């Protein structure tokens, strides 16, 4: 049995114990005793509520304190200075954005190199096929040999450049280990906060039930709807001539102002 059930059980036990005593005190006219019994019931209810709020506060504080990063992770020293969950998520966005921009820059630098090599290879392939069909004269063949030699050199250089870019792209993804850990911790924290708030709501609803407190759910829903749409206009009135709460002319306006003392 958790503490909330214990607190509610204590309140229920006290309520059952004092209910009959309260009735007897009222019937016998001992109003002082009745007031004292009511006071004890209120104290029991408040004590249980305060205990639960304190417990939930301690659990929430413990969850926040334990919100740490593995010190062996890269860049852990920098992120360990960040204590707010929102700032941690912003830090994740910063790392992710930086890695994405770096990756796109490297891809943009590699694309022209690959396109140029592809075009050169296509042109050489066409001329090589002509050579294989013995359609190339000696001077043109010597030029073809020079082009092939240049292509091989250029191809090796382009390959080294693209290979380096691919390696840099791979290194740019190292942020995922750190950001994954940060997001996992934030998710755990949010889950714990949600769970604790749910416990508080459930406990408060039980206290309301024992205290006989009833809420106007229709009014609460209407207020929540107004909060969601604070700028929603009422718009033009439909069938205004059939409604008594709508002014339809200057005479009605004058009567309204007169009734308000203007």
From Swiss-Prot:
Xref: Gene3D superfamilies: Helix hairpin bin
Top-tier EC class: hydrolase
Gene Ontology cellular component annotations, sorted alphabetically: bacterial-type flagellum; cytoplasm
Site-annotated residues for Enhances dephosphorylation of CheY-P: 181
Compositional bias per record (Basic and acidic residues), positions renumbered to this chain: 218-232
GO MF annotation, one: phosphoprotein phosphatase activity
Gene Ontology annotations of biological process type: archaeal or bacterial-type flagellum-dependent cell motility; chemotaxis; regulation of chemotaxis
The UniProt record lists the keyword Cell wall biogenesis/degradation: no
Predominant location category: cytoplasm
InterPro entries the UniProt entry points to: Chemotax_Pase_CheZ, CheZ_family_phosphatases
E.C. number: 3.1.3.-
Compartment annotation: Cytoplasm
The keyword Cytoplasm belongs to this UniProt entry's keyword annotation: yes
Alphabetized UniProt keyword annotations: Chemotaxis, Cytoplasm, Flagellar rotation, Hydrolase, Protein phosphatase
Region (Disordered): 218-250
Self-association and partners: Homodimer.
Function of the protein: Plays an important role in bacterial chemotaxis signal transduction pathway by accelerating the dephosphorylation of phosphorylated CheY (CheY-P).
Similarity comment: family membership: Belongs to the CheZ family.
Protein name from the UniProt record: Protein phosphatase CheZ
């Amino acid at each position: 049995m958790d503490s909330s059930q214990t607190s509610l059980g204590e309140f229920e036990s006290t309520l059952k114990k004092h209910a009959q005593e309260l009735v007897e005190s009222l019937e016998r006219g001992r109003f002082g005793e009745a007031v004292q019994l009511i006071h004890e019931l209120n104290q029991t209810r408040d004590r249980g509520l305060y205990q639960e709020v304190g417990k939930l506060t301690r659990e929430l504080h413990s969850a926040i304190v334990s919100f740490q990063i593995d010190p062996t992770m890269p860049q852990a020293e920098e992120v360990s200075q960040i204590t707010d969950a929102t700032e941690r998520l912003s830090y994740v966005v910063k790392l992710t954005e930086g890695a994405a921009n770096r990756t796109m820059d490297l891809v943009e630098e590699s694309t022209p190199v690959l396109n140029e090599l592809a075009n050169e290879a296509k042109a050489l392939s066409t001329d090589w096929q002509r050579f294989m069909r013995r359609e190339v004269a000696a001077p043109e063949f010597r030029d073809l040999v020079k082009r092939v030699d240049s292509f091989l050199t250029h191809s090796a250089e382009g390959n080294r450049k693209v290979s380096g870019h691919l390696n840099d792209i791979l290194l740019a993804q190292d942020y995922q280990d750190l950001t994954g850990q940060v997001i996992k911790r934030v998710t755990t924290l949010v889950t714990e906060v949600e769970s604790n708030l749910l416990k508080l709501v459930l406990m408060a609803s039980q206290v309301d039930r024992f205290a006989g407190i009833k809420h106007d759910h229709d009014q609460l829903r209407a207020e929540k709807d107004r909060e969601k749409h604070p700028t929603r206009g009422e718009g033009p009135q439909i069938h205004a001539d059939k409604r008594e709460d709508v002014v339809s002319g200057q005479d009605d306006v004058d009567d309204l102002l007169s009734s308000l003392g203007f």
